[in-house]
Amino acid sequence: MSDDDQKPEDATPDGSEPAENQPDGETPAAGEGAPDQAGLPGWGSSDKRRGRRSGPMKKGGDARAAKQMFERVKTARGRKSSSTRWLQRQLNDPYVKKAQMEGYRSRAAYKLLQLDERFKLLKPGMRVVDLGSAPGGWVQVALKSGASEVVGIDLLEMEAIAGATLLEKDFTDADAPSLVKAEMGGAADAVVSDLAPWTTGHKTTDHLRIVALAELAAHFAVETLKPGGFFIAKVFQGGSDSDLLNFLKANFEKVRHFKPDASRSESAETFVVAMGFKG
């Protein structure tokens, strides 16, 4: 599951909630809704509670003008400030609104679209695997590109997407690569991952955790891809990814970094793109 789809546990939006299961959530610091775990946290864990609250609305032209300029969220009793910030950011995020209008389950869909626009990766007839696929934005992008087979894997149960196979499974299980290839009828052309662990707020710790997760995804890709295939994974900037990059350079012809416009400007996330799997 992408950190785009994580949110503080007590966050419930005022008015209509995003159609994409609260996408692109602000991952809370330890003690503010995120599990405080040593080592690598469960990459698919999330609280899926949803709800609506409506508060009093001010009348008059000034209030309407203010609403047009910026959507604000009233801090409710019992709601942490991190949740209020998350809700306010959601209401004012153009990619959240665009995802709602265009039918994507997550604003994260635009990251894959922009990665594909930059590197021209997705082609009709491909077999694509999406690791940590909930709620399904990247699966939707792969299907719209004309992929013949799309398999999404997540620890979370996902609502069905026509044309895709969705597995409620840990991709690090020993049998996961063979199971995926059996579902697709052969090796994959692409393995993509927008996975992120719960963040702690400590930059170095978060960087090390996401690099470890990307390394697991890279090993899965090497076991699953056909020669010539590509791999995409999210990492946080931090300078401790040399082992990951060396592994990718040993197994792929080209390795590049790219930060899509859909990634938040304040976010440390970037994507590593490995092309031309050597087999």
From Swiss-Prot:
Catalytic activity: uridine(2552) in 23S rRNA + S-adenosyl-L-methionine = 2'-O-methyluridine(2552) in 23S rRNA + S-adenosyl-L-homocysteine + H(+)
Region (Disordered): 1-66
Protein name: Ribosomal RNA large subunit methyltransferase E
Compositionally biased residues, Basic and acidic residues: 1-10
One Gene Ontology cellular component annotation held by this UniProt entry: cytoplasm
Annotated InterPro entries: RNA_methyltr_RlmE (IPR050082), RNA_MeTrfase_FtsJ_dom (IPR002877), rRNA-MeTfrase_E (IPR015507), SAM-dependent_MTases_sf (IPR029063)
Location in the cell: Cytoplasm
Residues engaged in binding S-adenosyl-L-methionine: G136, W138, D154, D170, D194
Gene3D superfamilies according to UniProt: Vaccinia Virus protein VP39
Enzymatic class: transferase
PANTHER family according to UniProt: RIBOSOMAL RNA METHYLTRANSFERASE, RRNA METHYLTRANSFERASE 2, MITOCHONDRIAL
Organism: Maricaulis maris (strain MCS10)
Keywords: Cytoplasm, Methyltransferase, rRNA processing, S-adenosyl-L-methionine, Transferase
Catalytic residues as annotated in Swiss-Prot or TrEMBL: K234
EC number: 2.1.1.166
Family, similarity comment: Belongs to the class I-like SAM-binding methyltransferase superfamily. RNA methyltransferase RlmE family.
Function text: Specifically methylates the uridine in position 2552 of 23S rRNA at the 2'-O position of the ribose in the fully assembled 50S ribosomal subunit.
Gene Ontology molecular function: rRNA (uridine-2'-O-)-methyltransferase activity
Subcellular location, principal: cytoplasm
Entry superkingdom: Bacteria
Pfam families the UniProt entry points to: FtsJ
